[in-house]
Each structure stands twice: as C-alpha cells, then as structure tokens.
Amino acid sequence: MSNKPLRIGIVAGELSGDTLGEGFIKAIKAVHPDAEFVGIGGPKMIALGCQSLFDMEELAVMGLVEVLGRLPRLLKVKAELVRYFTENPPDVFVGIDAPDFNLRLELDLKNAGIKTVHYVSPSVWAWRQKRIFKIAKATHLVLAFLPFEKAFYDKFNVPCEFIGHTLADAIPLESDKAPARELLGLEQDKQWLAVLPGSRGSELKMLSQPFIETCKKLQQAFPELGFVVALVNQKRREQFEQAWKEYAPELDFKLVDDTARNVITASDAVMLASGTVALECMLLKRPMVVGYRVNAVTAFLAKRLLKTQYVSLPNILADTELVKEYLQDDCTPDNLFGEVSRLLEGDNHQMLDKFTEMHHWIRKDADQQAANAVLKLIEK
C-alpha cells in the first residue's frame, strides 16, 4: 500500500448502521489513524470524522408506500454517490446494511472497478434466496454476523467472512437483575415477566391482545407476578395503553420507555415478538417464549417463501427448538400462558446453558474482525 492515507467509501442507512459504522471506523483508525471516510453516516460516524455527503435520514425509509414516494430522491442520491466515488475512487467501499439501496450502489461501483463490501448479510438464507446472485454480482465480500449465514454463502461460492455479532460483544456473558430492577424502579423480591410486543405499529396491532390476555391468565395463576412492558416510543406506548384499557384495565402493567435490554435484564422470563430482541434475550440468558402474528396476506406469502424451520434467531442458530414459537393461529393466550407458567416454575438450566454456549460462538470482537477483513481485501 502507498503512503497516501487510506480512503474508505462508506454508507450507513439508519441508526443501527451508524453504530456499526462507528465501531468499524474506530477499529480501522486504531491501525490507520489518518484513514479518511466519506459517504453517508449518522452522528456517531460523523463525530469520528466521517464526511457525510447527504443526511442519513434520506435513506431511513420503511415500507413500500414511503419508499415509492421517496424513490426519485433516493435515485438522485445514488447517482450522486456513484458520480462522486467514480471521480474520487476510494480504496474500498463498505455498504452497511440498507440492502435495497446499498446493493444497487455497490453493483455500480464494482462495475466501475471499485472494491465493494456489504456489511450485514440480508436474510437470504431465510427467504428470496435468489438474491444471493445479485449480492455476488455487487460485492467482493460480505461480512456476516452469524455462522449459518457464512455456510449459506459458501454453498454458492460467494466470498463471505463470519465476523461474529456486535450484540454478543456488547452484552456481558452474565447479567445481573438487581441493578436493572433498581434502574427501572421494580421491586427486587418479586418475580417479573418482561412483555415485549414489538417495535412496529403493525406488530402491536397483532400482538397486544394475545399478550395482554395471557397476562390476565397469569395474574390469576401467579397473583404475585409483576408485568413490565418495554415500548420503544410514545406512539407505541399510546397504542399499548389503548389495548390495555380495552382488554384488561384491571391489570397492573409497569410501562417503560427504555431499551428492551434493561427490561429483559430485570426479568425472570420474557414473552416477546420475534426479531433481534430474541437474540438479545438469548445473550442476556433469560428464558423466553416467542409469539408472532402477521396479517393473512403476509402469512400466506411467508408460508411459501420462508426457507427456515424456525423464525427466532436462537432456534435458527441452535438448529433446534430451544425456545417455543407460537405463530399465527397458535399465538393464543392459552398456549402462551402454558409456556410462561412452565418457564416461571420450571428448571431452565438446559436452555440457559445452551444460550451461554451460543453466546461464545458469536462473540468474536466483530468491529475488529470487520476491519481486518476489509484491510485484507484492500491489500489483495
């Protein structure tokens, strides 16, 4: 490599990507303090000197309708970035997550002779598996959080590096209930069930009723049990309060506008919607049950498109049903009540020991591994 400072093109599309970008930039700068980063970043990346050509908010659009409305602007941003990077070629381009935007950008840059990396594998192993060919065309390397993702890429001879999961690095191997309870103002000497009905409006719409009715049954069976609910923002809080009023106004829920992490840490067992939060719960070593419902159309499509036997990451990782999953018509108060009761009364050692083992599998200092893999690619 020449004496010129390293130049890395980088695009993060949302807050989670900004956090990954921050860790990656720190790890690169530890080896190359004068490295330059340019593209699109959030506040954390910008604080480390990343030059952001556009506001990250431009890319953080969810849902088909919103995306269609923003399409002309998104295409303009992409065209500007292609022009900028072809005129000022970086040593490598790293697209963090945001696959709909980044893979298209990576394809154009790869065709222009720039080395490209996609950081965070899309869920190709789970559905729309043909996307892997598009990913192969667009990238020189994929950085994957989970070992089964790398195994999938290997099957198709697509270069992929398993770097471990940043959450597994961030969460200690053991987590103590008492400080979390103190922080949330929960009584220390009673049992608590964490209730996590999801972060999206559509999830709360589907799950508030079965989750609240499950708590109603639990209250009768375990009069001393406390219920603590994690809600990501004011909108979700209002939505849950509405359902609470409707289905069980007599129940005493403790609502918390805090991260799921503190609420899970404070609890004895967890009832949750599927998603990254199931992985977090596994890493915090709390027994859990997964309940999930989607609308009929999505369910119909998922049945045909999903290629995995399970929906929650702990089960996919273990390749067995460690955690009970109640989906669609099985997501009933009776089923959830039965499993939560078992978790509260039973011995969960086997489940929790496996959680610890899996934590070790994916705890590899992902920031450092990502930096190493990218530096190796630059030197090729």
UniProtKB/Swiss-Prot annotation:
Functional pathway: Bacterial outer membrane biogenesis; LPS lipid A biosynthesis
Similarity field: Belongs to the LpxB family.
Entry keyword annotation includes DNA repair: no
Gene name of the encoded protein: lpxB
Species: Vibrio vulnificus (strain YJ016)
Annotated EC: 2.4.1.182
InterPro entries on file: Glyco_trans_19 (IPR003835)
SUPFAM superfamilies linked: UDP-Glycosyltransferase/glycogen phosphorylase
One Pfam family it belongs to: LpxB
Function, in words: Condensation of UDP-2,3-diacylglucosamine and 2,3-diacylglucosamine-1-phosphate to form lipid A disaccharide, a precursor of lipid A, a phosphorylated glycolipid that anchors the lipopolysaccharide to the outer membrane of the cell.
Biological processes per GO annotation: lipid A biosynthetic process
One term under GO cellular component: membrane
Example GO molecular function: lipid-A-disaccharide synthase activity
Reactions catalysed: a lipid X + a UDP-2-N,3-O-bis[(3R)-3-hydroxyacyl]-alpha-D-glucosamine = a lipid A disaccharide + UDP + H(+)
Protein name, entry field: Lipid-A-disaccharide synthase
Keywords (A to Z) from UniProt: Glycosyltransferase, Lipid A biosynthesis, Lipid biosynthesis, Lipid metabolism, Transferase
HAMAP family linked to this entry: LpxB
